[in-house]
């Protein structure tokens, strides 16, 4: 937990850093104290997103930031399978930002450097295949032939599945409060750059979660009951952090 949390000291002043730590304890609670992997993933995901924002949106030309993102990407991709999805989302956001702003060729060295961060996880996956190291939870996806037309049709076009997923998301108080906090912060600060950046990353991850829930070969209710409270931690912390960042940036400008 400490490397990304040390970075938060540089992000905020003393008062706002304490506010961030309070938010962190409220969102992660036991995950932070015990050191559960999902809390670790949420922290690395949030600060990787923040550094990407600083480098490619705020145009901070800092190799220090770039190298930290590179290390965070490697750690994130090796922690859990969700981390791989997060890294791919952030890399996609980097591509979209640079192509839309016509800065791709200007930043191509940075992009290539960050792309190389997925090499360790690729090597690890190759080793797993060569030594027949399998994950039983992933193998059942293959055994159940989840990508068959009938399976996908029954799950993806089932309105009850969407309703159930939405219900579990809504019932997570911390997640709803984080969205409200982000919206309130945007209403008062009008910081479109921070708001749209964080919203695009958060929604991309939530969309990927919905897809995974829809194609799960397990009972959907059981899957949601056992996983939502853990995996929703990452977008919750992301929205809360960027909501606080909007307010902090506004207060700094006023002063």
Task: Indicate where each model-derived feature is located.
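Membrane-interface helix-loop-helix junctions at transmembrane boundaries of multi-pass membrane enzymes
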Residues: 9-17, 58-64, 99-112, 184-203
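Hydrophobic/aromatic-rich transmembrane helices and adjacent perimembrane loops
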Residues: 38-44, 79, 85-86, 222-247
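Transmembrane helices and adjacent periplasmic/lumenal helix-loop junctions
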Residues: 28, 36, 67-96, 118-126
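Membrane-embedded helix bundles of polyisoprenyl
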Residues: 1-55, 65-76
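Juxtamembrane "helix-exit" motif on the non-cytosolic side of transmembrane helices
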Residues: 28-30, 99-100, 125-132, 210-221
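Alpha-helical transmembrane segments of multipass membrane proteins
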Residues: 41, 76, 80, 120-124, ...
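Transmembrane alpha-helix segments characteristic
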Residues: 14-25, 68-71, 192-219
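Membrane-lumen/periplasm interface segments of specific transmembrane helices
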Residues: 96-97, 107-187, 202, 206-207
């Amino acid at each position: 937990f400490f490397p990304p949390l040390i970075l938060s000291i540089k992000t905020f002043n003393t008062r706002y850093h304490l506010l961030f730590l309070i938010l962190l304890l409220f969102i992660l609670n036991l995950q932070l104290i015990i050191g559960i992997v999902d809390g670790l993933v949420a922290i690395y995901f949030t600060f990787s997103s923040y550094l990407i924002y600083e480098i490619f949106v705020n145009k901070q030309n800092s190799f220090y930031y770039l190298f930290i993102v590179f290390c965070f990407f490697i750690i994130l991709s090796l922690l859990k399978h969700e981390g791989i999805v997060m890294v791919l989302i952030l890399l996609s956001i980097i591509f979209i930002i640079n192509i839309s702003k016509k800065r791709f060729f200007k930043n191509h060295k940075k992009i290539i450097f960050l792309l190389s961060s997925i090499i360790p996880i690729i090597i690890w996956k190759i080793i797993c295949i060569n030594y027949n190291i399998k994950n039983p939870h992933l193998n059942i996806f293959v055994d159940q032939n989840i990508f068959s037309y009938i399976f996908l049709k029954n799950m993806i076009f089932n309105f009850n599945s969407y309703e159930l997923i939405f219900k579990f998301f809504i019932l997570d108080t911390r997640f709803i409060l984080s969205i409200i906090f982000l919206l309130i912060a945007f209403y008062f600060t009008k910081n479109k750059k921070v708001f749209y950046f964080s919203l695009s990353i958060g929604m991309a991850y939530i969309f990927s979660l919905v897809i995974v829930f829809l194609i799960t070969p397990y009972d959907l209710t059981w899957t949601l009951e056992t996983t939502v409270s853990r995996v929703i931690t990452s977008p919750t912390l992301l929205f809360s952090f960027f909501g606080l960042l909007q307010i902090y940036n506004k207060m700094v400008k006023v002063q």
